[in-house]
């Protein structure tokens, strides 16, 4: 008896989805690039044609979420607008315009035995993607999976059941129009947690599980899956403001604008600023850096030294507690910590970083040391951490931002959804 046999009434449905996804993956595996491009263009067209229905379904989800008293960041991630849906359609078209990694040949060589070997890039197979209140993920995953030759089984949160159903209908319409199996992308519409549990254990059909959500979701997937899990999307984002970056009024303005963007442009995003580390040599500029945050409604929680520097300029902020460092806020909250220089900043980030970490500096040596020493999925110099995003890094879209080192790290675009196989050709050689 398998573990999933203990879930009566669940296994047959989800197992059937897995079997159908596996059959669809065989079709997608050898699909020419042109067919995949046409399917994505058809999907973008369906999203535009079905705008009213999709937004109406999403409005139902938003209304239910607000009535249930869900936190504002969760509702924010759930909400779609006409502009957001148009952007999602453009993202699909952007994926269609990307180079297709499938079939790429590498490491071609002829060995002394006369055999000719190479590695060929191939799809992973069937992806299981589990996420919370982000309906855009449904389309992002569909587009990336199709373009990379993978099938996908999606399990969104119960908050998105109506939105995801409408989006799945659009995806299936596009696939049917192009003569491709609709089973290439399937959404588990039943919000019962048992459905998710079985997906995690569907190792006979699913090749990888990719969770997108909070730490609790990632932990649940890792602890319960028999399918390999790619963990990511959670982590504390740091910016270290070096003293060399506040030597001119212009640089102070740049730092203030960048830090404000990092925190307020989309505070519910996983790549939004959580902790600002300020070099003691930069404390004189701190009021000019923090004032725009306060004006934007950010609650700043600072250590005593930073508090004193701000109080001297008439700015009052909350006292930071130990738990405020190492916390992913996903809201208009940021912690602030004074450090004695780069060494202390690196030690601090080493204990709490891993997602996206930024240095603001005019010292090239400091910048290079930061890039070399910080062990995170993305390390940035003089740029907002909000750029750690598949679309912003030229991937078109992303399934997730992986913070682990196997199988992929950072935003997972097309290439990260493939693996390789060895191709060996010969003329009848046998091994001695």
UniProtKB/Swiss-Prot annotation:
Endpoints of the signal sequence: none
Entry keyword set: Amino-acid biosynthesis, Cytoplasm, NADP, Oxidoreductase, Proline biosynthesis
Protein name: Gamma-glutamyl phosphate reductase
EC number: 1.2.1.41
Organism: Deinococcus radiodurans (strain ATCC 13939 / DSM 20539 / JCM 16871 / CCUG 27074 / LMG 4051 / NBRC 15346 / NCIMB 9279 / VKM B-1422 / R1)
NCBIfam families: PRK00197.1, proA
GO CC annotation terms, alphabetical: cytoplasm
Annotated compartments: Cytoplasm
Enzyme class: oxidoreductase
Record bears the keyword NADP: yes
SUPFAM superfamilies in alphabetical order: ALDH-like
PROSITE patterns with a match to the protein in the record: PROA
Cross-referenced HAMAP family: ProA (MF_00412)
Catalytic reactions of this protein: L-glutamate 5-semialdehyde + phosphate + NADP(+) = L-glutamyl 5-phosphate + NADPH + H(+)
Similarity remark: Belongs to the gamma-glutamyl phosphate reductase family.
């Amino acid at each position: 008896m398998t573990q999933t046999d203990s879930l009566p009434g669940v296994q047959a449905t989800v197992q059937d989805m897995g079997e159908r996804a596996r059959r669809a993956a065989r079709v997608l595996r050898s699909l020419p690039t042109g067919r995949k491009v046409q399917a994505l263009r058809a999907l973008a067209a369906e999203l535009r044609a079905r705008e009213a229905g999709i937004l109406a379904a999403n409005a139902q989800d938003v209304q239910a979420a607000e009535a249930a008293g869900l936190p504002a960041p969760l509702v924010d991630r759930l909400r779609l607008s006409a502009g957001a849906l148009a952007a999602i359609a453009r993202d699909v078209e952007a994926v269609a315009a990307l180079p297709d990694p499938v079939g790429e040949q590498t490491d071609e060589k002829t060995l002394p035995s006369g055999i000719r070997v190479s590695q060929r890039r191939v799809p992973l197979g069937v992806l299981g993607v589990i996420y919370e209140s982000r309906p855009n993920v449904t389309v992002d995953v569909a587009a990336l999976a199709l373009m990379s030759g993978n099938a996908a089984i999606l399990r969104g949160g119960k908050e998105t059941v109506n939105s995801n159903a409408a989006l799945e209908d659009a995806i299936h319409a596009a696939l049917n129009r192009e003569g491709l199996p609709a089973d290439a992308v399937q959404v588990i519409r039943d919000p019962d947690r048992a459905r998710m549990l079985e997906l995690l254990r569907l190792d006979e059909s699913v090749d990888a599980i990719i969770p997108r959500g909070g730490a609790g979701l990632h932990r649940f997937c890792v602890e319960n899956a028999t399918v390999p899990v790619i963990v990511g999307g959670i982590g504390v984002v740091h910016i270290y403001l070096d003293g060399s970056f506040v030597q001119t009024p212009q640089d102070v303005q740049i730092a203030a604008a960048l830090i404000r963007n990092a925190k307020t442009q989309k505070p519910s995003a996983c790549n939004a600023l959580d902790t600002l580390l300020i070099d003691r040599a930069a404390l004189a500029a701190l009021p000019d850096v923090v004032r725009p945050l306060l004006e934007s409604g950010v609650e700043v929680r600072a250590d005593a030294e930073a508090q004193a520097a701000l109080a001297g300029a008439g700015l009052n902020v909350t006292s930071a507690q130990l738990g405020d460092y190492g916390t992913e806020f996903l809201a208009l909250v940021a912690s602030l910590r004074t450090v004695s220089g780069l060494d202390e900043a690196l030690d601090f980030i080493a204990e709490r970083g891993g997602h996206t970490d930024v240095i603001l500096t005019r010292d090239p040596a400091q910048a290079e040391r930061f890039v070399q020493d910080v062990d995170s999925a993305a390390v940035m110099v003089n740029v907002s951490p909000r750029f750690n995003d598949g679309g912003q890094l030229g991937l078109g879209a992303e399934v997730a931002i992986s913070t682990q080192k196997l199988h992929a790290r950072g935003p997972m675009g097309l290439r990260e959804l493939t693996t390789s196989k060895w191709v060996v050709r010969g003329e009848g050689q046998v091994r001695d």
